[in-house]
Amino acid sequence: MRFDRSLFLETLKQGLSVQGLTVSADSLELMVQYAEAIAVTNESLNLTRLVEPAEMAIKNFLDSLTILRSDVLAELPEELHCLDLGTGAGFPGVPLAIVKPNWRWVLLDSTRKRLNFIAETAEELGLTNVSTLHARAEDAGQEPEHREAYHLVVSRAVAELPVLLELCAPLVAVGGIVAAYKGSEAAEELARSEKAQRELNLGLEKVACLDLPQQMGSRSLLLFKKTGPLAERYPRRAGIVQKRPLI
């Protein structure tokens, strides 16, 4: 297929300008290349339903980068160890790794084929700050190498908030940030997650709402700070988290 690089690039640049985000020309080119790789590979491997250039630029890349507007991240170290839980086709982790080369990323997913694509493409693009982890979040959260090991844990379109927080909390360090990318349903999910926040030692720091350009929807970014060590019983076993959420 022919990917319209110019349309993708111009749409992304306009969106970044509206959001007050500055990205280098080198980073923009890497994002164009990553988007093109997705569009081409998606013909044989189901990576994402978003392959139209303008839609991909806004709903995947720009949406991923909106966390950079948050002052909450200013409290974290300059060189971050980050995890993207349920990365799918690499969002938000890959765009953030491109724009922030001093942030080291682990992209976690349970689908090996997607991770293979991400790893191969990241190597082709020279993204030395990206690695992948094939695992369930419930299992990774109990492994010493990953438990409370990350300054920043992000997740987009993975699960309802009470479930998502239990998956993320074991992975983020005390004082670190969990960032949940949500849509217009964020207020309802926040109300249902009060017990989860208490149980998991997560305090809501900020809710950032925005409308995407070209009427492509509303987004909410929910930022939580880890206020204390997590009880050993969390996360619960795979399946239990979803069947009996902390609500």
Task: Write out the residue ranges for each language-model feature.
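Short alpha-helix immediately C-terminal to the canonical SAM-binding loop
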Residues: 114-116, 186, 190
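SAM/dcSAM-binding transferase cores
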Residues: 191-247
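Helix-to-beta-strand junctions that scaffold the AdoMet/dcAdoMet cofactor pocket
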Residues: 100, 172-174
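Conserved beta-strand signature within the Rossmann-like core of class I S-adenosyl-L-methionine
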Residues: 175-185
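Short "lid" loop at the C-terminus of a central beta-strand within the Rossmann-like core
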Residues: 138, 160, 183-187, 212
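Residue-level signal for inorganic ion chemistry
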Residues: 38, 96, 182, 224
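Class I SAM-dependent transferase core
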Residues: 1-79, 83, 113-130
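Conserved SAM/SAH cofactor-binding pocket of Class I
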Residues: 65-166
